[in-house]
Design a protein with these regions (language model features):
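Short Pro/Gly-enriched beta-strand edge/turn motifs at strand-loop
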Residues: 14-21, 113-117, 138-139
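Short, glycine/acidic-enriched loop or turn micro-motifs at the edges of active sites
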Residues: 41-42, 52, 78, 101, ...
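Conserved beta-strand hairpin/beta-sheet module of binuclear metal-dependent hydrolase folds
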Residues: 12-64, 156-168
């Protein structure tokens, strides 16, 4: 099911398509958000956090006639990578993840794949990213923000052109991700939110891993 279809035009030149899919990741939450971002002019696309149901993601990419350039993982947990192998095999695309969480893709004690009923995937990323790196999908630019806390290598993606933030499991609607898991830290996640994410423009739209997108400043700061 498609919850959001957003097309935006910047300066009459750049057209961005953003699709939010609800996929079954096998967790207690069951349905989680997977995002597809595409530059409509070049057809280049990026999938963010393919937590499950690879067929649903692939079907949408085919509908968009997308050229999958990147598969971006905000961190290494199993409920964010459930569709990773099939998606990579069938559509290509380079796997990107923050350098600190890269090891977790092949370490079930960090990825917690057993928790979501997955086998250990033993997969290495094609490239690693770090804080302030930039990623381009056609003419759309995203900046990597290292947001440790939920995991030590958690990251968020920010698009300054449209003030969009993909926050993974760091920031939700009025709350934050769990900090009782391997490599997680309560102090780190609060610092990531207060010192990095809350310093973005007030009208930034937050697209989290679960629940709805929002741009209500009060719900981002009343933590």
């Amino acid at each position: 099911m498609i919850l959001k279809i957003i097309s935006k035009v910047w300066k009459g030149k750049i057209v961005m398509i953003l699709k939010q899919l609800r996929v079954n990741s096998g967790t207690i939450c069951e349905l989680t958000n997977c995002y597809i971002v595409q530059d409509e002019n070049t057809k280049e696309a990026m999938v963010i956090d393919p937590g499950g149901e690879a067929g649903k993601i692939i079907e949408m990419l085919d509908i968009l006639q997308a050229k999958l350039k990147y598969i971006y993982l905000t961190h290494c947990h199993g409920d964010h990578i459930g569709a990773l192998i099939e998606l990579k095999d069938k559509k290509g695309g380079k796997i990107l993840i923050h350098r600190i969480d890269a090891e977790g893709l092949s370490n079930k004690n960090i990825s917690l794949t057993e928790y979501v009923g997955m086998e250990d995937i033993n997969l290495e990323p094609d490239s690693i990213v770090d804080d302030n790196d930039t990623i381009h999908i056609g003419d759309i630019e995203f900046r990597v923000i290292h947001t440790p806390g939920h995991t030590s290598g958690s990251s968020s993606l920010y698009c300054e052109q449209e003030k969009l933030l993909f926050s993974g499991d760091t920031l939700f609607y009025g709350t934050w991700g769990r900090t009782d898991l391997p490599t997680s830290s309560f102090d780190d996640i609060i610092n990531s939110i207060t010192e990095k994410l809350l310093k973005l423009p007030d009208d930034t739209i937050v697209y989290p891993r679960t629940w709805k997108a929002y741009n209500d400043k009060r719900r981002k700061t009343d933590l």
